[in-house]
Amino acid sequence: MRVKFHTTGETIMTQDELKKAVGWAALQYVQPGTIVGVGTGSTAAHFINALGTMKGQIEGAVSSSDASTEKLKSLGIHVFDLNEVDSLGIYVDGADEINGHMQMIKGGGAALTREKIIASVAEKFICIADASKQVDILGKFPLPVEVIPMARSAVARQLVKLGGRPEYRQGVVTDNGNVILDVHGMEILGPDSDGKRHKCDSWRGDCWFVANRGADVALIGTPDGVKTIVK
């Protein structure tokens, strides 16, 4: 794993400015003439703004949410359905938490299922995040699980058996018409947690657990500049 810094000087930056810095830094991975996979959330929104400056150089984007689609279109970027695309060079998205193994918890923006699918198609996953998202142990941020509405109670009971404390995210319906359970108390130590991911899939819940696609490159916004971590 390689780490390097792109310094921004000693200027004190807000969290949003750190997100903006990594969003723009991700442009270096965008190749002209390609279709770009785009995530969802406040950090991804900064990347979309940056991508707008290259709209004449790329074919377009595949979006992970209705919100990102609307923003991309407002900037004049063509949005492809994933079914129209054979492959993606890169997928750029934020994270709720990322550990030293480049594994993440995602889904705070309730777009995790589409995010996971698009990331799985991409050759390279570029994670963009501010330094507050770096952790040693995943799980302080509750693990979002997307569930079909009729299975909410059944999935919640299974999550309790796994040691979690599921909380129904009231009033939230995903772009897929599903609901979200935020699971507290699920400390995830590292790659050996694979079994829990399979259980998550098997009872028709969907989550972005450690065993799912990790980042290939992480751009971390810090007070000292953008830190690049390459897996």
Curated annotation (Swiss-Prot):
Main function: Catalyzes the reversible conversion of ribose-5-phosphate to ribulose 5-phosphate.
Record organism: Escherichia coli O6:K15:H31 (strain 536 / UPEC)
UniProt pathway: Carbohydrate degradation; pentose phosphate pathway; D-ribose 5-phosphate from D-ribulose 5-phosphate (non-oxidative stage): step 1/1
One Pfam family hit: Rib_5-P_isom_A
SUPFAM superfamilies per record: NagB/RpiA/CoA transferase-like
Residues given in the record as substrate binding sites: 40-43, 93-96, 106-109, 133
Protein name listed in UniProt: Ribose-5-phosphate isomerase A
Family: Belongs to the ribose 5-phosphate isomerase family.
Chain coiled-coil ranges: none
One example of a Gene Ontology biological process annotation: D-ribose metabolic process
